């Protein structure tokens, strides 16, 4: 396979993974029965506006509602209002949207239906601090968590316990109305309580756990946050809470389904796929080093399977940012992978975020090929220094190997494919 054909093949798998999670493909077939009363649509996340549009197209009856999505992710809707807000660090637009959404839950009855459209990114987008915590104090904690290297599960535990709307609080506010949540998962293991910090799902975590996470990562949290966590007042709704008895949650798209769609593309091309898992976590560079070892084992010893094959994985790695670069877990993974492969022939890879945004940059990810390191050094770039500086985006931008998709309007986490030809 030529270098260009290799890139086309890898990109076709990524496109299939994204396509399998598009709201137009998965919302209509999961709609609830119409209620006797009102239908209120609420939602948050990078895919939520596209989910709302798909819902409007399939719903035969009156509805109203409010969606909070990321800047650049809005799509036209006729009956559901779309509000854009900041991600990954919350802004005032998200706070105002969250307050309005919570207010919409007041006065609902058993005859009413709330359809909640939840996808990744909602943890930052739907930001309504608990009483006594300012928006800026919550932002400060969020920024520190993003740089700490904490996995998404731990970040969301803290976020829920600093929030007036997350961790099942939105659903509790809708009681006694029926709440049906349609969820596009972006979290390892499809923990529905973790997607968007679970505004409509019971929360098993506690204030004590949130406080321990702050201590574990040495987060210099503002005094208001420490006081709130130490007080532990008004715990999030737990499994068995009567206010959540009329809740139904449906997983309509997931990382695993997207990985399987990519694997089907490989089989069609006559290349054997192996899915390592949809919930791989850890430091992005360490995952890159490990993945390189697996690829080299295939190349040298045909283990765990012979070439041609493609190693596919998903999940959400982390980057502990120590340098001045922008981070980005997929580009950091690829730099580490390339360095460990050290130009090994017949191995190429793609890693990208299915939402089109890797870290804080409007770039989905990048490619590497056997000539990645020689080309970089020919441009005067020190790859090891780029990795140490967490500057994967700068590295691949100079090489012209970035993958730029614009917002995909869905989000099922990272996609990685290592092709041994």
Regions found by a protein language model. Give the residues of each.
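An N-terminal, well-structured beta->alpha segment
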Residues: 1-42, 50-51
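A glycine- and small-aliphatic-rich helix-loop capping segment at beta-alpha/alpha-beta transitions
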Residues: 54-63, 79-81, 102, 106, ...
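Glycine-rich oxoanion-binding loops at beta->alpha junctions
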Residues: 68-110, 158-159
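Glycine-rich, mobile lid/loop segments that gate access to catalytic sites or pores
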Residues: 106-194, 199-202, 380, 384, ...
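Gly/Ser/Thr-rich active-site loops/lids in small-molecule metabolic enzymes
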Residues: 133-150, 203-218, 323-349
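Accessory alpha-helical/coil subdomains and C-terminal extensions
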Residues: 177-180, 202-290, 294
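Active-site segments that bind and position negatively charged phosphate/pyrophosphate groups
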Residues: 270-351, 359
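Internal helix-turn-beta structural module
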Residues: 334-421
